[in-house]
A protein has these predicted regions:
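Alpha-helical transmembrane segments of multi-pass membrane proteins
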Residues: 2-534
């Protein structure tokens, strides 16, 4: 179902319904998000003295938070599906009460020193023991409160997804407020106590929302669907897979981009705050009936950003960290905007709201698992970053709309893929033979200039440039664009480039690389952006 299938009713609700009801649910959702995203930097900063400042600390932490969010959404979906709305609140309030036993937040005894080796699982266990229950209780609120609001019978409940934008706005404020306001003003212990107070306030607000729900006439989401006059069509499995994929790619890109900038661009405290803030901001911008940025403009900006980013990664000699950072921010932000807007356009009727968020969260978890746990074992360098940049082209509307019955289009895609793979193999071979091929006498200065161009930029950059021209010419064919973007990724990781330099080994603590110096006289050892010697 597209965005035209479910018409938001927020303006009508404001006119004909009670502003107080909207305000109560919005404020509760906002407070829940504040707590949800303030506990993440709070506890991670407590863990840093134990595990150090490796990029993997935040990557694994993000993986845990995505997994716990999935558990919370699963709990909310089961609660909404199997417990009547007027009784579900009692169950949720009991869970919140049990979570109080884990407060205030602190490092549990017996978890002060990780075991030898890569402490991936140990860190996940630490987070589960210390903040698992409170995080589960808070994470369930976003879909649960939206489902409750839809069940109140309020006119705005016909499309309660606007509450999700309020939730992400609260998350964004918490995330930015922690490093710049809260942490400099209060210590970790005081912040943990304040978080406990905020949790109690949230429990009271949830109770108010629940009692308000019990006092309303509407008791089910199916009634809300009927009142809206929209058929509550059950989502198909292809639609569910689409939800997962559209959530997976930007989620994995969030972790991959954070790892990339902290490994290959610059290392700085709290560097992860910017990508996560931008990720949350994308929901605020596009998870609404009328996105703040038109989709046509988003698609154009995204296409340009992906091309520029992959071209930059293909160069063995690229610009400084400022240019790399700005390019990375632009491509990550536009990619997440496009994926999340497409996700919003595919949202279901309110009856399937909690299921929608469950699949969305599953995609987030799978993306986090891939980028945080699988990719470091699979790749010797941060190859997942250019891979995910290419995959964002598959998140554009119509990118996967290729029918097996359309033999002509399938043939074109096969020809593009086969030609691209042949070019990836033969072009470097031919360019390597250029100085001794005798072409200098035939072409004169042209061959010499081409040779200098290859020596300066490398085969990967030249091939990526050629693929990018083909990609831009295919602007009316999203499936072809997605395939060509994958060819650009292969050029970046198969040939010497900005992410493939020398010999590398990767571990929990980063990427160790041995490569030639810029003048070619020495072999140098680097760990991320740190030079350890020659």
């Amino acid at each position: 179902m597209t965005s035209e299938g479910v018409r938001p009713a927020m303006p009508d609700g404001v006119k004909s319904g009670s502003l107080g009801l909207v305000a109560v649910f919005t404020a509760t959702t906002f407070l829940s998000a504040l707590l949800l995203f303030s506990v993440q930097p709070l506890f991670t900063k407590m863990v840093l003295p134990v595990l150090g400042g490796s990029p993997s600390v935040w990557a694994v932490a993000l993986c845990f938070f995505q997994g716990a969010l999935l558990a919370g959404y699963c709990y909310a979906h089961l609660l909404n599906g199997f417990v009547p709305a007027r009784a579900a609140g009692w169950v949720h309030l009991v869970l919140c009460g049990l979570a109080l036993l884990a407060l205030p937040i602190s490092l549990p005894s017996g978890w002060t020193e990780p075991p030898p080796g890569d402490p991936y699982l140990w860190q996940l266990g630490l987070y589960t023991v210390a903040i698992g229950l409170p995080f589960l209780a808070v994470s369930a609120n976003a879909p649960l409160l939206q489902a409750w609001f839809a069940a109140t019978g309020h006119p705005a409940g016909r499309d309660p997804y606007f509450l999700y934008a309020a939730s992400n706005l609260g998350s964004l404020i918490a995330l930015l407020g922690y490093p710049f306001v809260l942490e400099p003003t209060f210590g970790a212990r005081t912040l943990a106590d304040l978080w406990a107070v905020g949790f109690i306030a949230l429990l009271i607000a949830i109770a108010i929302c629940f009692l308000t729900l019990r006092g309303r006439a509407v008791s089910s989401l199916s009634t809300s669907d009927q009142a809206a006059g929209t058929p509550a069509e059950a989502p198909t499995w292809s639609r569910r897979v689409g939800w997962v994929g559209l959530a997976l790619v930007p989620s994995a890109l969030l972790t991959a981009f954070t790892t990339h900038i902290s490994t290959d661009v610059a290392s700085a405290p709290l560097l992860w705050v910017l990508p996560l803030s931008l990720y949350l901001l994308t929901f605020v911008i596009v998870f609404r009936e009328r996105a703040l940025i038109p989709m046509r403009m988003l698609l154009a900006l995204h296409l340009a950003a992906v091309v520029v980013a992959l071209l930059q990664l293909s160069q063995t000699r690229h610009g400084g960290w400022v240019i790399s950072s700005l390019t990375g921010v632009a491509v990550f932000f536009t990619s997440a905007l496009v994926a999340h807007r497409t996700l919003y356009d595919l949202r279901p009727a309110p009856r399937y709201l909690t299921e929608f968020y469950l699949w969305l969260s599953l995609g987030g978890v799978l993306g986090g698992l891939f980028a945080a746990l699988i990719a470091p074992k699979l790749f010797s360098e941060v190859f997942e970053y250019p891979l995910l940049l290419a995959l964002t082209m598959a998140c554009r509307p119509g990118a996967l709309n290729v029918s097996i019955r359309n033999r002509d289009e399938l043939l074109r895609l096969w020809l593009i893929g086969a030609s691209g793979l042949l070019a990836l193999y033969w072009v470097p071979v031919l360019l390597g033979q250029l100085p001794t091929s005798g072409l200098e006498g035939l072409w004169g200065d042209l061959a010499n200039r081409l040779n200098r161009l290859v020596n300066r930029w490398g085969e990967a950059a030249l091939l990526t440039l050629a693929f990018s021209v083909l990609l831009l010419l295919s602007f009316r064919h999203p499936p072809r664009q997605a395939l060509i973007a994958l060819l650009m990724f292969l050029a970046v990781v198969m040939l010497p480039s900005g992410v493939k330099r020398g010999e590398a080994q990767r571990s929990y603590f980063g990427v160790y690389r041995v490569a030639l110096s810029s003048d070619g006289d020495f072999h140098i050892l680097t760990h991320g952006t740190t030079l350890h010697g020659a």
